[in-house]
């Protein structure tokens, strides 16, 4: 017999915490510790919400919602980011477990004035979320790439220089093609604060402040290629195009990489990043939403107007 228990992060007992991390690591092939759990799910409220699927007093599944603060037309609203959804394979006989787990969470979210839940499901379950759980699709996140070294580091620093020379004509074309776009038109803005960065950024993430600019990135390897994932960039002067150029220049100077990747709707007059064609994307990244407040504007607002990038949801 299974049951569902909804708790806040600060209400999870030590035995539940140990049990959860074991199930989580098994589901995602990771090795987080109970200590990681506390910091991972901290939010501006001080906690997240967890819906545990329990069988024989063991946690065998979970849905977590992290409260996040946004500004809609400069008015503060609260959203919930759905993350770390899993059900262990031997407990998937009931196809409605996930639906029941999420529905059990909703009253707690509404009680905390959370007006929407948002998620980026993988391709294996995205249909379930939209057809069974009745989430609406806002759109798909773009892959934007900046090529640093087409020689993949084989000829040292010369590779970056030659790459810049070879791509110069394409950069000019890109600048012309993106003329007229404006990142500042985004009406749904993620609220960035010191508390947000404290719980969002991990040890592997780099937060750089220099010359009035701020950038956040993490370096990883994708298919044996060294990649810098640009999470966010901004300028104290409000010039995002200049901040993007400064971010790319900094990363190129500091890291041995071949590509810089920015995932999200860039919407900026710039020449450094190219939007990857849909047929070349490694996987689709649909953004889906559950409107908890019956706010029609949320459902009708295209993803281009959302400030939604790896800084919001990435689990790296």
Which residues does each PLM region occupy?
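Mid-sequence acidic-hydrophobic segments that form the walls
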Residues: 66, 85-88, 104, 108-112, ...
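Conserved acetyl-CoA-binding loop-helix of GNAT-fold acetyltransferases
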Residues: 87, 92-109, 239-250
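Short, glycine/acidic-rich beta->alpha junctions
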Residues: 45, 97-101, 121
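Active-site/acyl-donor-binding loops of N-acyltransferases
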Residues: 40-43, 49, 66-67, 115-169, ...
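Short loop segments at secondary-structure junctions
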Residues: 56-58, 88-91, 291-293
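Amide-forming acyltransferase catalytic core, primarily the GNAT-like/NAT-type
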Residues: 4-6, 10, 15-62, 69, ...
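Long, hydrophobic/aromatic-enriched structural stretches that serve as scaffold segments
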Residues: 62-70, 74-103
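Short, intrinsically disordered terminal tails adjacent to the first/last structured region
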Residues: 1-5, 310-312
